[in-house]
Amino acid sequence: MDLAFELKKALETGKVILGSNETIRLAKTGGAKLIIVARNAPKEIKDDIYYYAKLSDIPVYEFEGTSVELGTLLGKPFVVASLAIVDPGESRILALVKR
């Protein structure tokens, strides 16, 4: 199983929310099943995401690449520092990250 493949599948068949503000909001409310944060995301954003995700019992996966690489992987012409998986759709991304 490949993270890139499963992430694209989740984007196509599920509900994926991009952006740090929305990701933090979903972490606060417990509205995400998984949060992915880029390795080089700003420290303040990462701290908020990890804090609220822990309170809401949401797993956080740190993407090994940069926010530019994460945006490119998703086919977006902009950087993506973090994203929230609300519905994985047909992807198996939740199982991949739990390993």
Curated annotation (Swiss-Prot):
InterPro entries: Ribosomal_eL30 (IPR000231), Ribosomal_eL30-like (IPR039109), Ribosomal_eL30-like_sf (IPR029064), Ribosomal_eL30_CS (IPR022991), Ribosomal_eL8/eL30/eS12/Gad45 (IPR004038). Transmembrane segments: none annotated. NCBIfam families: PRK01018.1. GO terms for cellular component: cytosolic large ribosomal subunit. It holds the Pfam family Ribosomal_L7Ae. Signal peptide: none annotated. It comes from Pyrococcus horikoshii (strain ATCC 700860 / DSM 12428 / JCM 9974 / NBRC 100139 / OT-3). GO terms for molecular function: RNA binding; structural constituent of ribosome. It comes from the Archaea. The keyword Ribosomal protein applies. Keywords: Ribonucleoprotein, Ribosomal protein. This is Large ribosomal subunit protein eL30. The lineage of its organism: Archaea, Methanobacteriati, Methanobacteriota, Thermococci, Thermococcales. HAMAP family: Ribosomal_eL30. GO terms for biological process: translation.
